Structure formats: structure tokens, C-alpha cells
């Protein structure tokens, strides 16, 4: 009986090693955050950019009123969730210590169904994000920092 169980047990244990580990829920939320708000190196930051990005990222069913795209390095954005580039801000939110290049896309009105028309505003701002397990998962807002 032990001889029969040993090969079965061995196959079971080997099978566990081959089973892919599913990404954590936090990873999905982080990926969703990147899909909605991250564009490393934008090509132009005008109304056409907003039209294409909102459409390609599937943020137009219905037309989203406003969306902000953050440009730059993902690691700098992740660092907002740590003390390297972020600090506590209102509850569980974090505010960046450095500014990021951003593009704000605002729906110009009209129908809430595609094709959606957007106006673009480009700027450099500090940003506020919500973090879970060291990863940004929610974009809250951005601020223009005072120039000295």
C-alpha cells in the first residue's frame, strides 16, 4: 500500500510545483492604476493625445469626465508609497515629494457615449495617491506647487 501511495504522492507534490501562482489582488489593482493613469513617454499632450489615450485605455464607455495621465518613471511613482518620494496626506493617502509631468484630459461635454471629445491640459504637479502593500492603486488628485 505504501508503494502505491508514494508515486501518487510524488506526482501530487510535483504538480503543486508546476502550478502557476496567481498574482495577488493588489497586483491587479496596481495594474489597473497603471492602465488608467500611467503613460511613460507621451507622444504629444494635446486634445488628440487625450482622445486616443482615453479610447485606447477603454475609458470611454461611458465617456469619463476627467482622467489624469502621469508621465515618467514607474519606480518614482511607486516611491510615493514609501518615504523616498512620499509622505502621509489626509487619512490613508500619500502626497509626492516631487513633481510629475501630467496630462489632464477633460470631457468637453455633449454625449456621454463615444466618440468622446477631450481637452488636454499639460502641467507639472505633485500628486496624491492611495497605496496598498507599497503599490499605488488609486489616483486622488494633483496640485500645482507654488513657485518661489
Curated annotation (Swiss-Prot):
GO terms for molecular function: actin binding; copper ion binding; DNA binding; endonuclease activity; heparin binding; RNA nuclease activity; signaling receptor binding. It comes from the Eukaryota. Its main location: secreted. Serum and milk. InterPro entries: RNaseA (IPR001427), RNaseA-like_dom_sf (IPR036816), RNaseA_AS (IPR023411), RNaseA_domain (IPR023412). One of its GO terms (cellular component) is extracellular space. A motif (Nucleolar localization signal) lies at residues 55-59. It holds the Pfam family RnaseA. Gene3D superfamilies: Ribonuclease A-like domain (3.10.130.10). The active site is at residues 37, 138. It is found in: Secreted; Nucleus; Nucleus, Nucleolus; Cytoplasm, Stress granule. GO terms for biological process: actin filament polymerization; angiogenesis; antibacterial humoral response; antimicrobial humoral immune response mediated by antimicrobial peptide; cell differentiation; defense response to Gram-positive bacterium; innate immune response; negative regulation of smooth muscle cell proliferation. Keywords: Angiogenesis, Cytoplasm, Developmental protein, Differentiation, Disulfide bond, DNA-binding, Endonuclease, Hydrolase, Nuclease, Nucleus, Protein synthesis inhibitor, Secreted, Signal, Stress response. Disulfide bonds join 50-105, 63-116, 81-131. Residues 1-23 form the signal peptide. Coiled coil: none annotated. TRNA binds at residues 45, 105, 127. Its EC number is 3.1.27.-. PROSITE patterns: RNASE_PANCREATIC (PS00127). Belongs to the pancreatic ribonuclease family. Secreted ribonuclease that can either promote or restrict cell proliferation of target cells, depending on the context. Endocytosed in target cells via its receptor PLXNB2 and translocates to the cytoplasm or nucleus. Under stress conditions, localizes to the cytoplasm and promotes the assembly of stress granules (SGs): specifically cleaves a subset of tRNAs within anticodon loops to produce tRNA-derived stress-induced fragments (tiRNAs), resulting in translation repression and inhibition of cell proliferation. tiRNas also prevent formation of apoptosome, thereby promoting cell survival. Homodimer. Interacts with RNH1; inhibiting ANG ribonuclease activity. This is Angiogenin-1. It comes from Bos taurus. The gene is ANG1.
Amino acid at each position: 500500500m505504501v508503494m502505491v501511495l508514494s508515486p501518487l504522492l510524488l506526482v501530487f507534490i510535483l504538480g503543486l510545483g508546476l502550478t502557476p501562482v496567481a498574482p495577488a489582488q493588489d497586483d491587479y489593482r496596481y495594474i489597473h492604476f497603471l492602465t488608467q493613469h500611467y503613460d511613460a513617454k507621451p507622444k504629444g499632450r494635446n486634445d488628440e493625445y487625450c482622445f486616443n489615450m482615453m479610447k485606447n485605455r477603454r475609458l470611454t464607455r461611458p465617456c469619463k469626465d476627467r482622467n489624469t495621465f502621469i508621465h515618467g518613471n514607474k519606480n518614482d511613482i511607486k516611491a510615493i508609497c514609501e518615504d523616498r518620494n512620499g509622505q502621509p496626506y489626509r487619512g490613508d493617502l500619500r502626497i509626492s515629494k516631487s513633481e510629475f509631468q501630467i496630462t489632464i484630459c477633460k470631457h468637453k461635454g455633449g454625449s456621454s457615449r463615444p466618440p468622446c471629445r477631450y481637452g488636454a491640459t499639460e502641467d507639472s504637479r505633485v500628486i496624491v495617491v492611495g497605496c496598498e502593500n507599497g503599490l499605488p492603486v488609486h489616483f486622488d488628485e494633483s496640485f500645482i506647487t507654488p513657485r518661489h
